[in-house]
């Protein structure tokens, strides 16, 4: 090998490449840019339609009715500020988890960020690390998982001169490699550039609201023109009045408030979790977490502490005593590049003189469950799971497994090691058993019990022997510890058939972990997966939500939705419940927002239909103006729902968000429609003035909205009672203030309208209580 290559680039060569732009600066970030945040909050369908309506109102100089647009601008500004705060939190936490690349420059090893690499850099990679840039192997041997690029789960062997593809990761082994491509020339970058579709947002709430927005977006222009022409031509109203009335109907149909509150709530959850040392790399995963009903756990580092220690070494033959076994293990582990927790535990225990030089090495693989090394003067040494290397069961191994220990067998063969066709030899001889303990994480039992009490199904998926996993699960208080299967002895078809009913899966390969998750998803479960090793990556990517430990392999942190910076499994319930808080509270207050959407649509249809009847006295003009709706929104849709979204609510999430919310909002919307028709007809028969009719409708509209606020605040607490008093008090104070009355084009309820208001609200309250109780029973 060229010694200059091993020395790496000089600083002069690095600067030359930087000047030419040969830098690895094409990196995908978990955090969006500031410009993307601004675009997402400003350039939306809602804002475009609101802007068009505002232009129409400005054209006719209806300045007082443009207050709604100031609220829209404030909401957009608030969204930007909240999202920037969340971005700052995510960026800050990302710095804590960002993995450096070991790079050789001027003969010295330095740690660089992936984007600091230049063409020709020499990098050192080991098992568990993601490949930051396309590179050619200079030295070493590794097995690489390219599933994230090619979809193939089989490991690909990489020897000298082989090309390592960026975005893949080392499943085993270690190599020295030279950067072959940088930036947009990398294989992973080309895949991103060639992709014609953007990954859809995984949010059922936002998808539901998008459906509603799509419907209103299609009808809003024809409805707007119809309402404008009706008022202008058929009713003969001035242009200003026609624009104002038709604009109100269109504004009411847009469910903008609930969409903004949903995003704000999710961003707030990101910030809250960040303060608890949980990095949320995908905002909408918070909502997905709320819907999780099946949590799949990797045993190591989740239920256990992930702090392996060699408890005992048991020789199995008189030929090789304890001293010889220790010497073999010391040589094996000194030459080994394996850095998994088991290898680290052996390395810590067997530190000594290297007796046997290494000829060749086959790193440990989670697919094979063993590794091997050819040692000079000894033969080929194997280290791995007894059941994967030996034909017959060793009684001592069974006893250790039942104690909850991880058991490895040290074995010897005189056959040559073949990297290309790794298989156990026919002459293999067991030399010793290694019993390795991994203490159970403190509080794991309470956490598992709590999750079960919250209707979250639990499954343990591990590469360990199922007897070991079962024993540990029993100690951790796992109820179904007796329900286990050895996945190394069953077919994929059998695994699919057993996935739903079995609780513990042992000796699972990475492919099988993924298959279990796929099967559970097909059965209708929303799945979450916890893990920390490269053998978990395929399953983590397949799960609806992936949670990894910060102490785990770097490649797992790159693809996870959430990273536990404290690496503490006991944080999982709080993360789950933060998601439930957001989703349940949004579903709880959504009917308050949808009342306006429904009654605006129904009244617009009635107004257009009345124009088609042909009689001018039957023509109904939309009865509200924008400033009235905006003022009521501040006390009904504004402060109360916003405050209620912060309350703790950890009950399981109910399905069919939009359907349930629309049905709960429908009675109130129908009350508004009835109020408009009744007051218009009855008021005309009684000779009421337009200001009296407008005043009564304003009070009825606000009061019907408050019925939904009251329902959302049940059961009452002191804080909720104060919230209602503040909202109702603010509504009445503004409605009774003379200057604001002039702005709202209303007055005070009179001796004629007050009794009608009281009677109607009494009837509406009774109907509201009855319908709410009926819906609650369903």
Q: Can you annotate each of these PLM segments?
A:
Residues 3-8, 14-29, 74-77, 85-88, ...:
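Actuator/coupling domain of P-type ATPases
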Residues 23-102, 346:
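Transmembrane helix-loop-helix hairpins at the membrane interface
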Residues 98-207, 490-499, 503:
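Cytosolic catalytic regions of P-type ion-transporting ATPases
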Residues 64-98, 105, 202-297, 451, ...:
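Hydrophobic alpha-helical transmembrane segments
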Residues 48-70, 218-255, 267-268, 272-277, ...:
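Helix-interface capping motifs at the ends of transmembrane segments in multi-pass membrane proteins
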Residues 78, 108, 180-183, 196, ...:
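Conserved beta-strand/loop elements of the cytosolic catalytic core of P-type E1-E2 ATPases, chiefly
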Residues 227, 338, 480-528, 543, ...:
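Membrane-embedded transport module
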Residues 291-429, 436, 449-450, 458-470, ...:
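Cytosolic catalytic regions of ATP/NTP-dependent phosphoryl-transfer enzymes
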């Amino acid at each position: 090998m060229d010694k200059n290559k091993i020395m790496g680039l000089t600083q002069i060569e690095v600067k030359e490449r930087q000047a030419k732009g040969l830098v690895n600066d094409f990196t995908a970030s978990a955090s969006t840019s500031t410009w993307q945040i601004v675009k997402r909050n400003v350039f939306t369908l809602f804002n475009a339609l609101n802007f068009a309506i505002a232009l129409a109102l400005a054209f006719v100089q209806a300045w007082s009715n443009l207050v709604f647009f100031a609220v829209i601008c404030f909401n957009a500004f608030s969204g930007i500020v909240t999202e920037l705060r969340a971005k700052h939190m995510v960026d800050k936490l990302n710095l804590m988890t960002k993995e450096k690349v070991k790079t050789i420059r001027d003969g010295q090893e330095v740690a660089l960020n992936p984007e600091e690499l230049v063409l020709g850099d020499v990098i050192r990679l080991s098992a568990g690390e993601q490949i930051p840039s396309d590179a050619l192997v200079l030295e070493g041997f590794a097995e690489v998982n390219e599933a994230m690029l090619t979809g193939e789960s089989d490991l690909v062997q990489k020897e000298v001169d082989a090309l390592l593809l960026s975005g893949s990761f080392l499943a085993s082994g270690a190599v020295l490699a030279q950067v072959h491509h940088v930036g947009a020339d990398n294989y992973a970058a080309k895949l991103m550039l060639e992709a014609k579709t953007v990954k859809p947002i995984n949010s059922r709430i936002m998808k539901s609201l998008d459906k509603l927005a799509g419907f209103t977006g299609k009808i809003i222009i024809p409805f707007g023109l119809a309402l404008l022409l009706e008022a202008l031509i058929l009713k003969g109203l001035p242009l200003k009045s026609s624009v104002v009335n038709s604009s109100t109907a269109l504004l009411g149909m847009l469910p903008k408030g609930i969409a903004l509150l949903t995003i704000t709530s999710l961003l707030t959850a990101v910030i809250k979790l960040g303060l608890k040392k949980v990095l949320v790399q995908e905002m909408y995963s918070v909502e997905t977490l709320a819907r999780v009903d099946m949590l799949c756990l990797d045993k190591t580092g989740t239920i256990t502490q992930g702090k392996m220690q060699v408890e005992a070494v048991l020789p199995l033959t008189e030929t090789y005593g304890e001293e010889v076994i220790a010497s073999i293990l010391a040589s094996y582990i000194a030459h080994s590049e394996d850095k998994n927790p088991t290898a680290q535990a052996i390395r810590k225990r067997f530190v000594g003189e290297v007796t046997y030089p290494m000829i060749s090495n086959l790193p440990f693989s989670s697919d094979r469950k063993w590794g091997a090394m050819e040692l000079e003067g000894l033969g080929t040494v194997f280290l791995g799971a007894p059941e994967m290397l030996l034909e017959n069961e060793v009684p001592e191994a069974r006893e250790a497994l039942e104690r909850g220990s991880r058991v490895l067998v040290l074995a010897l063969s005189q056959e040559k090691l073949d990297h290309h066709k790794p298989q156990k030899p026919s002459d293999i001889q067991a030399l010793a058993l290694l019993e390795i303990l991994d203490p159970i994480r403190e509080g794991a039992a309470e956490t598992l019990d709590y999750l079960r009490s919250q209707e979250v199904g639990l499954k343990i998926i591990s590469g360990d022997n199922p007897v070991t996993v079962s024993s540990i699960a029993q100690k951790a208080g796992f109820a179904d510890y007796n329900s286990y299967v050895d996945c190394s002895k069953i077919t994929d078809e059998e695994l699919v058939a057993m996935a739903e009913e079995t609780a513990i899966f042992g000796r699972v390969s990475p492919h099988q972990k993924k298959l279990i998750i796929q099967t559970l998803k097909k059965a209708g479960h929303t799945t979450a997966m916890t893990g920390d090793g490269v053998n978990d990556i395929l399953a983590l990517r397949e799960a609806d939500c992936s949670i990894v430990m910060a102490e785990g392999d770097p490649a797992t942190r790159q693809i996870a939705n959430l990273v536990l910076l404290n690496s503490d499994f006991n944080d999982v319930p709080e993360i789950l419940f933060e998601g439930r808080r957001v989703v349940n509270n949004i579903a709880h207050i959504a009917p308050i927002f949808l009342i306006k959407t429904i009654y605006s649509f129904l009244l617009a249809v009635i107004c257009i239909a009345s124009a088609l009847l042909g009689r001018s006295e039957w023509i109904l003009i939309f009865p509200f103006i924008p400033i009235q709706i905006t003022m009521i929104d501040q006390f009904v849709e504004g402060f109360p729902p916003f405050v209620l979204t912060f309350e703790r609510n950890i009950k399981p999430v109910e399905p069919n968000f939009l359907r349930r919310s629309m049905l709960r909002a429908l009675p109130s919307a129908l009350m508004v429609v009835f109020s408009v028709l009744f007051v218009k007809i009855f008021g005309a028969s009684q000779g009421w003035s337009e200001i009296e009719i407008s005043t009564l409708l304003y009070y009825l509209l606000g009061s019907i909205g408050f019925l939904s606020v009251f329902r959302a605040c049940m059961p009452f607490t002191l804080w909720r009672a104060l919230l209602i008093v503040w909202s109702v008090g603010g509504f009445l104070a503004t409605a009774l203030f003379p200057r604001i009355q002039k702005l709202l084009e209303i007055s005070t309820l009179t001796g004629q309208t007050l009794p009608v208001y009281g009677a109607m609200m009494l009837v509406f309250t009774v109907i509201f209580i009855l319908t709410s109780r009926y819906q609650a029973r369903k």
